[in-house]
């Protein structure tokens, strides 16, 4: 606004026009701008007619209770008005905004991810970068989404230089005719820091870089609608006239808009980056998610108590004991109870002191500085890991305090609104002092979440009214309004609010206890239940309304209201949460995709079926595997409170809240019983339907976060192990003749050899000096070939080894490193060692040079990185890999720090299988902690960082610095002749502030010897030690005292002398010196003095463990990393490499008799493969040399090779279940087979295998989880077998190509379903399920009965086509039409005649004997005579049964007949039609069947009930049964 007004005034002054002459549109615009700046509110009785501007103001007022994480936006708005300052202090987080917006149906615009160059708006607000800080109030862990961005401020695009310096930019050479244009310009880059243009040139590599291309010319004027420009034209008389025209306001594309924000971030060019670099505060303090803030003593005391509770004492839900050992307080573990409390108080005091160092602005010390230089203040009770944990939990405390203050202030405002306003609705539930105290003393984000959820339920609908009321008080224009309705309408349209609006809450208040009273009764019965005299439904009658039309609806609404309020009570939630987490169980079951995907190599193979496993038994990152599998659709995860035993015994969670009579009246009247039942329903609804699902999701997220934290800790531990050891340090004392007069000050020569995985590529060796710079390199084309290989391989190998020997003889490295790529590395290492030994034996080198196998992963990451390509553009990839390997052998820390670059190559390291599934910023945080520790422990040679690019990244991990401050510091050094002579120059020359200097000074070392060679200035010897500048005087005093010279002696000379003979420091009484310092007011400094003494004895002595070559289990893990993991019990595919023989005992060969075969030939008793016609040949074979065709020995097994280069042994007894003499009878060389790993010995690199089918089929039950669900496993196994069988059958059936309306390529089941929808006369012809040369014909007889017969095909042209001849029952047919007409349709017609007969039994089949006989008797009663009944057979389709009474005893006989193509066959006779059969039957029904007459044993003339299977009569044709 001010900018626009000023521009308008300048235009007026320059043009000489009055206000009246202003263009009307511009005057209206200015008037509108001024009207927007006025703070007034026009009261209106009709809110529905408010205009858009009023709604916009109301939205801004919402910021009074909605958190906005964008602190820069708050700062920019804080200067606008008193009102916005008031609301800005009371904001909640984005999650609260989402909740309230959801409740109020407010839509908000999504934040943009790209940097925006916004036009200057009417209100002249600065351009801001969206803040991605996670302020999730509803998460205890605080960072579920995990993509927090760097906190770099963004502001208005500033300029570099004055307006006069920019005047030439606008200069246009006048050609005499063209009009000159003078545009009123306002630079949008005035606020950019000094020197930013130079920085931009460095980043973009452009010498003529012009910042004008980054910003619009009219950046400050884009918000104006009517902008003008002056055009000076010649008036034709030698004069000039000025013409004002409207400027073209078309948006122009700028260079900055075309650049990705990430590219801009890399250059640290933004004003916020410059501010961070220049501010005298550690950069990590400024970039922390919740920045470090000032705190008073009371807050620090509370925070120290909170940290020791939640950081070191509070347990996790899952079992993380093994991983938490590094973070535990060793000083108070396993102490006697009498000592524990005193020690704990001392630890709390130390934690408070650490917090003072961090949060008191006069200190601002990082944890690393505290651990090194403030040991006495923490009484040596806290380790470095403990200090970082305190630092991390300080961030959580600040985050918690920020949220707590916002919630507390919101509740305070609501309470003020309740007390002072006339809103009767707001007064129904007053906020008490206890509610405010609960908020003030909340200790976890979970507690705050519960408080906030309860507040949202009870008071969320009143927030708009509260805002309007506060707005009226601020403006002084609030009009008193008379509330004409008892319940005000709410924006929210949920079920609870509907109940509130219709007064159902009054009925909920008559249940006997409020939700608050119920929660207070959980621990002890504090409140008695007030019993209502009316029955529940009678009481509900009083509240019937249009929305709740009957008493049942009213009562249900009241129950829902009370249940909702109970479920939001913080005490209830806390109680349910504790119960749920203590006893929760989970179930795991693989999905169909999981059953096919999870094999023995999957980490969940032995844990894929889990039943009722307690959540507390989960360990480390186990649950993250389940979560990842669930996200991939491999398993289903179910979490429940009750175990299977609890479910069987009906022991549910809600019973704990129903059984204690918390909400029960102890009376037995009908009224009380009904109310007790209603109360139980409320509690059950609150617990089971509302809280349990919420707690299930919360628990899931909690244990998932714990699993992710476990992965981060394991990554930290693995990373720490890689940088915890120093580089190789040669023994210079015994190396005098080897250096040829070289300066031995750190002069190490390291060589590394790398061979590629592709054997046809060349291998490379490289030599680096003590600075990691390349001295020389070597190319060996045939290094990977074998010395005794076939053809010319041996000669080519010798050529490469000769090159290697000459290189070593010339360069004389102190050590040689070889990459661990696969198992070949062990052979190649032997080749190098033999070459070195050969040189030493010939006296070509003065001592043996050690050869080390080295972890190759970091070197390969560097090889593939953009950084390596930029630094070594002319070197092939393998040479770049060798360079990195040599630097790792020299010192691993600079090389790992080198990977922490703008491309984040450090995350390409494989530290854990699940490292990609956790928050990458969380991973970066823990890795940076370790790197900061080790970098500062080693010290940073700042001149080396300025000189060598691969050392540069170490500087950002120096205590107090960061990437921005390190970049800024290096620029200052480069401007200072690339040399820092002393630590004091960091302040004088590089302008480091006192706080940053205090943090970093002790860890920045100056190589005093090399600096002395480059400058004549005084060099402080202590600058090359860990002694901090604040204690230099004490170090000098110690040197003078140790030499026992006069105090007037030169302390510098004393220091030089004491460093040459440090043994004299042992005579110093440092304890007395410490006492003297304490008396002088310096405090306890004993540890500091001892550290100074140690440092004077050996300046910057490497405190890391010495370099050690990987061996044993570690070497095995590195070798096995190239392929799939091999573990005991696993089934692995391997290739048979050779047969293993046991050598022949030459002495016992004479006593061994050859075997004689049936053919008369003699067989060798050892190898079992050589035969001879005479025993002498066998004897000669056994005594001969195996390399010349002699007996190789007795075969004992086979040697197997796996894809990762590992080899294993499978003995004869494990090849087959039967006896095996010669393995080659069972397996073949170079053929792959599956083997089971029975035993794995990592120390000896041996695998003991078996390929017996019995071993391969069996799973290793010992590896299965304790809670393995065997029942579900077996059920799924049967299901998989069934599916596999169906799939096999489907795949084996040939799809037929037959053009006929009755033919379908379907199965029998599908055909029956189709027939159910078709007419009775239809049939389906389909492929036979058993033979490709056959068809099946199916038709429906009656309900559930289908007839099916086989048709044989012959004379087929193709397997999928129909045969030219079809045969059924001895009859042949030419085509399907003839088959249907002559064979199928006659039988269908007869069967239809039977099923539609008036005496047919339609309600079942003949196998249902009792039902058929009952139907016969019903027909007899109906007809008055003995009837007969037809029924179809289910077991034998196409056969029917006739049931009838054959005498006066009402006994029923059942006889079977069947239909044939030419009629009906009954009692071994054929009948053309059913009528003829029945005519014959009526004449002979009293005669027994032939089978009964032929029986040898007298049998009854009747049979009661149907037989187990219908009697079978041999048909006259075959094939259609």
Swiss-Prot record:
Segments forming domain S1 motif: 1183-1252
GO cellular component, one term: transcription elongation factor complex
PROSITE patterns xref list: S1 (PS50126)
Subcellular location: Nucleus
InterPro entries, sorted: HHH_9, NA-bd_OB-fold, RNaseH-like_sf, RuvA_2-like, S1_domain, SH2, SH2_dom_sf, Spt6_acidic_N_dom
Biased composition (Acidic residues): 45-56, 67-76, 90-99, 166-176, 191-200, 209-238
Major site of localization recorded for this protein: nucleus
Tissue spec. comment: Abundant in embryos, and less abundant in larvae.
Biased composition range(s): Basic residues: 26-41
Motif stretch (Nuclear localization signal): 26-42
Annotated GO MF terms: DNA binding; histone binding; nucleosome binding
Family: Belongs to the SPT6 family.
Physiological role: Histone H3-H4 chaperone that plays a role in maintenance of chromatin structure during RNA polymerase II transcription elongation. Required for several aspects of morphogenesis of C.elegans, including regulation of division in the germline and gut and specification of ventral-uterine precursor cell fate.
Protein name in the entry: Suppressor of Ty 6 homolog
Gene name per UniProt: emb-5
């Amino acid at each position: 606004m001010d900018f626009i007004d000023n521009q308008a005034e300048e235009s007026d002054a320059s043009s000489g026009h009055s206000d009246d002459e202003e263009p009307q549109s511009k005057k209206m615009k200015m008037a509108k701008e001024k009207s927007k700046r006025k703070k007034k509110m026009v009261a209106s009785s009709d809110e529905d007619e408010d205009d858009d501007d009023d709604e916009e103001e109301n939205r801004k007022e919402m910021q009074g209770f909605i958190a906005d994480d964008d602190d820069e936006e708050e700062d920019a708005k804080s200067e606008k008005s008193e009102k916005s300052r008031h609301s800005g202090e009371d904001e909640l987080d984005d999650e609260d905004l989402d909740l309230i917006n959801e409740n109020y149906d407010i839509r908000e615009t999504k934040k943009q991810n790209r940097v925006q160059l916004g036009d200057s708006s009417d209100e002249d607000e600065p351009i801001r970068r969206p803040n991605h800080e996670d302020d999730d109030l509803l998460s205890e862990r605080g960072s579920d989404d995990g993509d927090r961005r760097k906190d770099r401020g963004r502001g208005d695009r500033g300029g570099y230089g004055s307006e006069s310096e920019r005047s030439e930019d606008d200069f246009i050479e006048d050609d005499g005719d063209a009009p000159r244009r003078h545009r009123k310009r306002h630079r949008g880059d005035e606020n950019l820091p000094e020197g930013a243009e130079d920085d931009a040139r460095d980043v973009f590599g452009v010498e003529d870089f012009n910042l004008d291309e980054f910003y619009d010319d009219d950046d400050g004027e884009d918000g104006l609608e009517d902008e003008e420009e002056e055009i000076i034209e010649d008036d034709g008389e030698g004069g000039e006239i000025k013409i004002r025209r409207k400027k073209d306001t078309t948006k122009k594309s700028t260079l900055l808009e075309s650049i990705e924000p990430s590219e801009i971030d890399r250059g640290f060019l933004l004003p916020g980056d410059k501010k961070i670099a220049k501010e005298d505060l550690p950069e990590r303090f400024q970039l922390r998610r919740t920045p470090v803030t000032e705190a008073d003593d009371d807050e620090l005391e509370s925070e120290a108590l909170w940290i020791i509770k939640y950081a070191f004492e509070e347990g996790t839900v899952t079992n993380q004991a093994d991983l938490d050992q590094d973070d535990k307080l060793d000083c108070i573990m396993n102490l006697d109870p009498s000592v524990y409390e005193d020690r704990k108080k001392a630890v709390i005091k130390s934690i408070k002191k650490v917090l003072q160092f961090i949060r008191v602005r006069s200190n601002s010390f990082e944890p690393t500085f505290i651990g090194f230089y403030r040991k006495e203040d923490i009484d040596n009770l806290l380790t470095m890991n403990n200090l970082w944990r305190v630092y991390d939990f300080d961030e959580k405390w600040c985050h918690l305090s920020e949220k707590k203050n916002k919630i507390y202030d919101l509740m305070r405002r609501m309470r003020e609104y309740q007390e002072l306003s006339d809103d009767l609705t707001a007064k129904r539930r007053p906020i008490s002092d206890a509610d405010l105290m609960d908020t003030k003393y909340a200790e976890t984000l979970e507690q705050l979440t519960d408080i906030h959820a309860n507040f949202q339920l009870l008071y969320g609908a009143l927030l708009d009214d509260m805002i309007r009321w506060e707005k009226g008080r601020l403006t002084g224009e609030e009009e008193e309004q008379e509330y004409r309705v008892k319940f005000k309408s709410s924006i929210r349209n949920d079920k609870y609010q509907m109940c509130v609006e219709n007064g159902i809450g009054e009925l909920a208040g008559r249940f006997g206890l409020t939700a608050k009273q119920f929660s207070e009764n959980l621990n002890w019965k504090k409140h008695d239940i007030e019993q209502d005299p009316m029955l529940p439904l009678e009481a509900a009658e009083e509240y019937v309304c249009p929305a709740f039309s009957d008493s049942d609806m009213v009562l249900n609404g009241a129950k829902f209201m009370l249940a909702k309020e109970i479920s939001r009570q913080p005490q209830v939630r806390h109680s349910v949460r504790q119960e749920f987490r203590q006893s929760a169980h989970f179930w795991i079951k693989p999905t169909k995709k999981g059953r096919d995907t999870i094999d023995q190599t999957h980490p969940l193979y032995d844990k894929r079926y889990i039943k009722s496993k307690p959540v507390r038994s989960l360990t480390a990152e186990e649950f993250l595997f389940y979560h990842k599998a669930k996200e991939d659709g491999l398993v289903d995860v179910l979490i429940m409170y009750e175990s299977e035993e609890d479910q069987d015994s009906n022991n549910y969670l809600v019973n704990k809240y129903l059984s204690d009579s918390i909400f029960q009246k102890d009376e037995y009247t009908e009224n009380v019983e009904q109310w007790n039942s209603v109360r139980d329903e409320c509690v059950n609804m609150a617990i089971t339907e509302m809280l349990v699902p919420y707690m299930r999701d919360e628990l899931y997220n909690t244990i998932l976060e714990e699993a992710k934290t476990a992965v981060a800790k394991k990554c930290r531990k693995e990373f720490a192990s890689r940088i915890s050891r120093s580089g190789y340090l040669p023994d210079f004392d015994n190396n005098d003749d080897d250096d040829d007069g070289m300066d031995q000050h750190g002069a190490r020569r390291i060589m590394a050899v790398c061979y590629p995985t592709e054997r046809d590529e060349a291998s490379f060796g490289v030599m680096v000096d003590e600075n990691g710079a390349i001295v020389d390199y070597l190319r060996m084309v045939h290094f990977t070939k074998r010395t005794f290989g076939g053809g010319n391989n041996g000669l080519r190998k010798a050529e490469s080894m000769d090159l290697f020997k000459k290189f070593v003889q010339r360069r004389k490295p102190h050590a040689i490193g070889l990459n661990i790529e696969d198992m070949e590395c062990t052979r190649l290492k032997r080749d190098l060692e033999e070459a070195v030994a050969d040189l030493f034996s010939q006296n070509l080198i003065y001592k043996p040079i050690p050869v080390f196998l080295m972890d190759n992963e970091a070197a390969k990451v560097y090889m593939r990185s953009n950084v390596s390509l930029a630094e070594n553009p002319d070197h092939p990839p393998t040479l770049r890999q060798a360079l990195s390997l040599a630097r790792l052998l020299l010192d691993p820390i600079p090389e790992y720090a080198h990977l922490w670059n703008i491309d984040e190559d450090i995350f390409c390291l494989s530290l854990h299988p699940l490292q990609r599934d956790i928050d990458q910023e969380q991973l970066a945080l823990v890795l940076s902690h370790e790197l900061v520790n080790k970098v500062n422990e080693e010290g940073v040679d700042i001149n080396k960082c300025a000189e060598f690019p691969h050392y540069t990244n170490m500087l950002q991990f120096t205590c107090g610095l960061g990437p921005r401050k390190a970049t800024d510091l290096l620029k200052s050094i480069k401007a200072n002749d690339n040399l820092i002579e002393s630590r004091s120059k960091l302040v004088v020359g590089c302008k480091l502030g006192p706080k940053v200097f205090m943090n970093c000074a002790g860890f920045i070392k100056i190589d005093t010897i090399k600096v002395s060679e480059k400058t004549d200035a005084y060099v402080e010897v202590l600058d090359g030690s860990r002694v901090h500048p604040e204690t230099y005087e004490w170090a000098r005093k110690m040197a003078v005292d140790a030499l026992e010279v006069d105090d007037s002696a030169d302390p510098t000379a004393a220091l030089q002398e004491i460093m040459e003979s440090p043994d004299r420091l042992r005579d110093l009484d440092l304890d007395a010196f410490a006492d003297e310092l304490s008396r002088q007011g310096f405090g306890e400094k004993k540890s500091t003095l001892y550290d100074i003494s140690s440092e004077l004895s050996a300046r910057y002595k490497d405190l890391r463990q010495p370099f050690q070559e990987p061996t044993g289990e570690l070497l095995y893990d590195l070798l096995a990393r190239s392929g799939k993991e091999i573990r005991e019990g696993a089934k692995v595919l391997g290739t048979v490499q050779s047969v293993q023989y046991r050598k022949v005992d030459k002495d016992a060969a004479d006593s061994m008799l050859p075997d004689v075969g049936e053919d008369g030939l003699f067989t060798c008793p050892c190898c079992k493969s050589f035969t001879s016609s005479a025993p002498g040949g066998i004897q000669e074979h056994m005594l001969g040399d195996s390399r010349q065709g002699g007996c190789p020995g007795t075969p004992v097994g086979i040697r197997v090779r796996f894809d990762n280069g590992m080899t294993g042994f499978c003995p004869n007894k494990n090849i087959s279940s039967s006896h095996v003499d010669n393995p080659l009878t069972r397996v073949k060389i170079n053929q792959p087979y599956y083997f089971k790993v029975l035993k794995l010995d990592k120390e000896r690199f041996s695998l003991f295998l078996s390929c017996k089918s019995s071993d391969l089929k069996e799973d290793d039950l010992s590896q299965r989880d304790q809670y393995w669900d065997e029942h579900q496993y077996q059920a799924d196994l049967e299901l998989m077998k069934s599916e596999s069988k169906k799939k096999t059958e489907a795949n084996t059936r040939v799809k037929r190509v037959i053009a006929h309306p009755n033919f379908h390529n379907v199965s029998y089941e599908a055909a029956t379903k189709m027939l159910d929808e078709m007419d009775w006369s239809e049939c389906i012809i389909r492929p036979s399920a058993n033979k490709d040369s056959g068809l099946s014909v199916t038709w429906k007889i009656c309900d559930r009965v289908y007839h099916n017969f086989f048709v044989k095909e012959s004379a087929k042209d193709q397997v999928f086509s129909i045969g030219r001849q079809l045969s059924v029952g001895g009859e042949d047919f030419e085509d399907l039409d003839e088959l249907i007409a002559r064979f199928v349709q006659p039988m269908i017609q007869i069967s239809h005649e039977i099923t539609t007969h008036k005496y047919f039994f339609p309600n079942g089949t003949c196998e249902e004997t009792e039902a058929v006989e009952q139907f016969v008797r019903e027909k007899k009663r109906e007809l008055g005579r003995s009837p007969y009944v037809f029924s179809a057979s289910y077991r034998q389709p196409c056969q029917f049964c006739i049931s009838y009474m054959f005498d006066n005893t009402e006994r029923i006989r059942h006889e079977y007949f069947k239909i044939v193509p030419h009629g009906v066959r009954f009692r071994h006779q054929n009948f053309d039609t059913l009528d003829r059969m029945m005519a014959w039957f009526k004449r002979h029904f009293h005669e027994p069947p032939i089978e009964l007459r032929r029986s040898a044993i007298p049998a009854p003339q009747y049979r009661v009930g149907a037989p187990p299977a219908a009697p079978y009569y041999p048909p006259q044709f075959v094939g259609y049964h």
